[in-house]
């Protein structure tokens, strides 16, 4: 039987990313069994519990993982990222390949919840053209503002929009790895359109902004572009810019808006 929903107030992991191999001491919150059960030798066991996430920070999602220390094979039936405020039933299957029974007592850990950046689930085309991204570097060498030239294809108007990042945000240019493969199924042939910006969205927010090769040419050379992002190399290894010149109309780089998290800003 399922237990009443448990409210989890999730804390983010250091750097905002889940560990490569989550463990009980670093992975966040442990899901505990609501009842005792035994997995018989060469048998299967099932644990069911309801979970409800109280809040998820902007740009994050909750993921469910096995607990590596359990000497059982686990398969978790879940929806992937857990949406805040949504109650879901978490079903955990256990396979015991040993010759001895494995007993679980009410309150024993059976899975773990991890906060990580939301995965990309969809992509939409925005009608940004021309000199699409102009970073405005702040005193601390972090990109705190950027401008986009917008042409509204539906209304026929145009203009320049300046976007200011929040106190706990900063911008960083990164390479678009495997961009064509990633988005071909969602937006066919989008990369044949010159000077077009793609906003990649999740269920809750829009994230990257693409700078095309023509915009790079306007910056004259790679050194000038790297100068715009001086100081970012020491922020976090995961955010280090990887810039390269692409042929044709492939995007050169994207401007990611990243957020610092701490318990006071959640």
Swiss-Prot record:
Protein name, UniProt field: Uncharacterized protein ORF27
Phylogenetic placement of the source organism: Viruses, Duplodnaviria, Heunggongvirae, Peploviricota, Herviviricetes
Organism: Ostreid herpesvirus 1 (isolate France)
Superkingdom per UniProt: Viruses
